[in-house]
Amino acid sequence: FVPLLVSKLVCVVTKKC
């Protein structure tokens, strides 16, 4: 589990970068 990776994924999926 990589929190940073998850955060980036959420960022891209929700388009809130």
Swiss-Prot record:
Keywords: Amphibian defense peptide, Antibiotic, Antimicrobial, Disulfide bond, Secreted
UniProt signal peptide: none
GO biological process: defense response to bacterium
UniProt entry tagged with the keyword Secreted: yes
Tissue-by-tissue expression: Expressed by the skin glands.
Function recorded in the entry: Antimicrobial peptide.
Membership in a protein family: Belongs to the frog skin active peptide (FSAP) family. Brevinin subfamily.
Name of the protein in question: Brevinin-1AVb
Originating organism: Rana arvalis (Moor frog)
